[in-house]
């Protein structure tokens, strides 16, 4: 990664939009508030990040299984978890300009020292009505009383909009893992401890989304539910806490931009023994990347109660039957990607100009290698001899437009670790020039040695 320089959030996000990492959603129709589409670079990088998550948390560990549950679930699922009754945000409207806000957020913004997470609805309302909180839009201090705003998106199954056909877009991936616990145990013949994982889209009707892709109404989670024998909660909590920190450090995030934040007792759900967030220092301030939560047996017990199904586990070691306890490591994929892009962005002052460079980890950047024919006349040879050779092992791009210097700058700006230039000498000596993104150093390598050279560089 680059030095820990500070760049404005606007500078970074403008670069991401112009470069093709992220586009405004529905742009040709004027866009949609806080809606973003991932372009070719962003989509590829998201997939790379998910693959690294799968390798670290699933493929390299015993008894870890990934499934792909449905986005629309039986609505009783959300009654069991309490989402239908309790998944709300405290909403207030300014009486003067009619702007709408989350009560806890505007209080926290104006009084950072207050623990709004630990405040009851009544306490939040007292603060809002005290005249000490002003509208961020018009500056007045007059709000409606707090009312609870349901954050789940509601829709209907079938041709009629009746209460009996009401369903919800899932607000988290976790419950698809819990309701499939019995199926996974049966079909994998696993013993505890055992984990079930999923990476997928979730939907929350946030009142105040913002900060680019940090808080949106549609986003992706990468979640694990890890099941084990009751009494081992803190052992596995510490294990997954360390695994999650190891993962984000492996991705290249700078240590000084990361911190653990342990939840205070007032913040914890009544069933939780402990919850910790890993936060990242974004240009706009500290923000949560992921959380590790001890959920005890709450979810499985609730699903047993509402479904009338037996979700207990018979332990073959001591022949006891119990409801497993759970630790949940949960990543926000979009937030993690945004943190990596913010951390990687750099501007380097060179002798004649300034270059923008994304110091992304190898294997994480959208492209591993860029193949650059020195002249358009060399395109077919470069494609046949270099692109076709490397594309089987590496994610390659092929660029023939502009001077070689401009092409180097374009690849630096999107984080491509290596550029390979195929020139007229390559036709004679079967060698190419390999340029390193970070050092800008160049070496001449035989084409038939490229795979071995790059395998070593990428640690494969």
Task: Tell me what each language-model feature is.
Residues 1-460:
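NTP/phosphate- and nucleic-acid-binding module
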